[in-house]
Amino acid sequence: MQFPFSGAGPGVFTSSPALSLALADAVAGRNSGGGGKMVTAAHGGVGGGGGGGRAKARDALEVENEMSRSGSDHLDVVSCGDAGGGGGDDDDDEDAEHGNPPKRKKRYHRHTPQQIQELEAMFKECPHPDEKQRAELSKRLGLEPRQVKFWFQNRRTQMKMQLERHENSLLKQENDKLRSENLSIREATSNAVCVGCGGPAMLGEVSLEEHHLRVENARLKDELSRVCALAAKFLGKSISVMAPPQMHQPHPVPGSSLELAVGGIGSMPSATMPISTITDFAGAMSSSMGTVITPMKSEAEPSAMAGIDKSLFLELAMSAMDELVKMAQMGDPLWIPGASVPSSPAKESLNFEEYLNTFPPCIGVKPEGYVSEASRESGIVIIDDGAALVETLMDERRWSDMFSCMIAKASTTEEISTGVAGSRNGALLLVSDEHSVMQAELQVLSPLVPIREVKFLRFSKQLADGVWAVVDVSADELMRDQGITSASSTANMNCRRLPSGCVLQDTPNGFVKVTWVEHTEYDEASVHPLYRPLLRSGLALGAGRWIATLQRQCECLALLMSSIALPENDSSAIHPEGKRSMLKLARRMTDNFCAGVSTSSTREWSKLVGLTGNIGEDVHVMARKSVDEPGTPPGVVLSAATSVWMPVMPERLFNFLHNKGLRAEWDILSNGGPMQEVTSIAKGQQNGNTVCLLKASPTKDKQNSMLILQETCADASGSMVVYAPVDIPAMHLVMSGGDSSCVALLPSGFAILPAGPSIGADHKMGGSLLTVAFQILANSQPSAKLTVESVETVSNLISCTIKKIKTALHCDV
């Protein structure tokens, strides 16, 4: 697997300090932002002798003067004797008749905005076009080739002059600073007096305080030089230690990941670097390290990273980035094809022996009792460019929204580095919860698998033009070494995240190729034996699941915003605002369902002890009190969930559960008849990704004041069917564009995963792992006490539903 940055040589990162493409974009941005001032001179070949030489000198001087003026527009200075000028005028003809050489008279031609835009775009692509490119450009713009040639010459000259002026300004600032420091030292030395006698002090007694200040200043300079050297290593260009710091603001956070394409794709910050930020990455590093950005904390709250050597985190992040890129590119023998490992369902498996020989352990040796899980997957994602996806991955809210079925909770406490010039190149985050515990909670939708609680750094870097990488690596050991401690839930699974992440490469057809690598070590002692093969194979939280979820979500966003015809499975004819409100309600329903299945801290569920009665140990029952909670009925809410193995393929099981005509075979809400579809909103080209509103068959008294809101999601890694009964008046309000947050619902549903290659002690092959979960209102009074009867009711509902499903699929063995 090869990437454009692999073996590209000096063409990838331009080594010329005067005209690198990055700086070219910066100056271009400044020029265009200020009005885009430039003059292009096209000299003719008619004039001769000494007059012609003087005319050329005058032309060059005028061009330079025009370039230095900030208020001029894009003009063409064309000699009347030029071939493009159409010849001379009457005065020139008279001079020629008297034998005198014609006078050079300049005619100014103003470029149109379209011509300027085309020239600027071509300059960003190729600052040195060849003759063929200039001819093609001149023909397209209606200009002479010579005009195009001189426009590019003047553009390069202008950029070089501005860069030189900027560098001279920095050198002057540094020189003034050194002069001032030297003067203050001389004054302190000459005016020093002895405290005891009042006379002149000896040099050794001058100022012990100043001596300490000098030592501290030297130490800080040495530390800054070390950090700048580290930054230069991954930026690929030299870093100025004396560059003035710049204050970078935190990146804005949109309201929802459903606004990804609007706020993240369509309005991405410009990748060009303005001239004010050419002070190198040292300024950004100084700012971000001196002023800690804590978006989840108030300004008065002390930072958990205060006084910590953050360069160590940067070293760890760069080491992890190097390992991720190599693992994404390398093949055999590091990655063994799946055909060579018959017991593995993955396309390829990591050769752990080769891995240990190739990469030094960046986070220490594997703890005793931990098992390893590694996977790699590639796929094409429907998104405009990789930079937009990087923005989503580097924003913890949008990241957790994008992978809501896999991420129970995540947030960012510290933003060590915000990146360069507003982009995410070089951004380094500590991903954590709001209590300064750097962590994220990864979930498998089953009560038999504890939450994976991981503490890690997230680091993004632009490897080449159109190529990005985002890497995660656990920071537990480093945090402990720095004296940062955090309490983790004992009910969660201990987990370490080795260098994992994705490499994003823009494709010519406007999509993004994503190569995802997942490498984790965890303690599987708390995992039920039914799910251990699934986790080890990477089917639960491996690279394939991340890729499949990303593809499904991006397809959904692209479809909802596109103006193309709706898929056949979309029957919605409601107002766009009503569609948005209905999708928002379905999203909340699915999130509540996931929170009820897992043991995440996002919801205050309490596991019941002593009230389980005859319930089996594989059925997990939890309860919580709802008091004045929008979107949830008041009272005591019970949640029960369990997971079972089903000897049917996941596709067949999913098709059965979301089939409206077969609903009566397992759902007591169907009133014994098929469901009728009121409306449906497609979330993908496949029939399995929809949000629909169902209506149950009427009862004997022909009264039915209830609808069923249902969301189904399906991809190559698994599927879900989530539903909840809703009131008809409330749904009328939602479908007319009203606020959906006031609609009370309690979700129930199913999560389906493909079973691992070997399940349990009897080695059952294939099949599906089905998770069933129900939430019911046990009592409408929040202060009421639970009874064993309420717990047994929800448990019996689960058992009865599973039995009906097995009977309908003829797999009740």
Swiss-Prot record:
Residues 62-112 are annotated as: Disordered. Residues 101-112 have a biased composition (Basic residues). Residues 152-191 form a coiled coil. Keywords: Coiled coil, DNA-binding, Homeobox, Nucleus, Transcription, Transcription regulation. Its main location: nucleus. One of its GO terms (cellular component) is nucleus. GO terms for molecular function: DNA binding; DNA-binding transcription factor activity, RNA polymerase II-specific; lipid binding. Pfam families: Homeodomain, START. It is found in: Nucleus. InterPro entries: GLABRA2/ANL2/PDF2/ATML1-like (IPR042160), HD (IPR001356), Homeobox_CS (IPR017970), Homeodomain-like_sf (IPR009057), HTH_motif (IPR000047), START_lipid-bd_dom (IPR002913). Residues 306-559 form the START domain. It comes from the Eukaryota. Residues 104-163 bind DNA. Probable transcription factor. Belongs to the HD-ZIP homeobox family. Class IV subfamily. This is Homeobox-leucine zipper protein ROC4.
